[in-house]
A protein has these predicted regions:
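Bacterial N-terminal signal peptides that target proteins for export
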Residues: 1-10
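Solvent-exposed loop/turn segments at secondary-structure junctions
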Residues: 53, 75-77, 95
């Protein structure tokens, strides 16, 4: 490479790249802390240092029967927290059932998500996992509105085949 080009690359392009990527990392940490605080405000304990996190492919889990979600320090921690937090809502607030209809989920999830779910989970787990995956990708406002509606009301809505009456994710925020 031409020495002048290399000098330009090292003095301009590289520092700009570092500046552009550094705030993203900080924003990701802030986002995780923001989501953690949202859960903790709802009396959900979020644990990041747990013995199970030594398991090679474990990103997180919901501790059944508790108000505790474990998020390991790998992967997309925000997505993991939202996914496992939705499992908490399914177990504690929906009593083990799902909120969104299976046919609706199949229509809304990408082909890649559907393929991954088909490969990773047994048919009896598919709907719960698909719903948690879908909900983890919603805006925080939408996610926590649904979470609160399920987990703070006396009359928890029961799931139906068509859940658009309760949750319409196509409505603008």
């Amino acid at each position: 490479m031409n020495p002048q080009r290399l000098a330009v690359l090292l003095t301009t392009v590289l520092p700009i790249t570092v500046l552009l990527t550094a705030p993203k990392a900080a924003a990701a940490r802030e986002s995780f802390e923001t989501v953690r605080q949202q859960f903790e405000a709802r009396s959900v304990t979020v644990v990041s240092d747990h013995p199970r996190c030594s398991e090679r492919n474990l990103f997180g889990l919901y501790v059944r029967g508790s108000r505790q979600v474990i998020v390991c320090r790998r992967g997309n921690q925000v997505n993991t927290l939202l996914h496992e937090g939705w499992h908490l809502a399914q177990a504690r607030c929906l009593k083990g059932t799902s909120y969104l209809g299976e046919e609706w989920l199949k229509a809304e999830l990408s082909w890649r998500d559907r393929r991954d779910l088909d490969v990773l989970y047994k048919s009896g787990q598919w709907r719960r996992e698909a719903e948690a995956r879908y909900m983890a990708n919603q805006s925080l406002e939408r996610y926590f509105a649904a979470f609160d509606a399920l987990c703070t009301s006396d009359a928890t809505p029961r799931p139906t085949n068509s859940s658009s009456e309760r949750f319409n994710p196509t409505v603008n925020d």
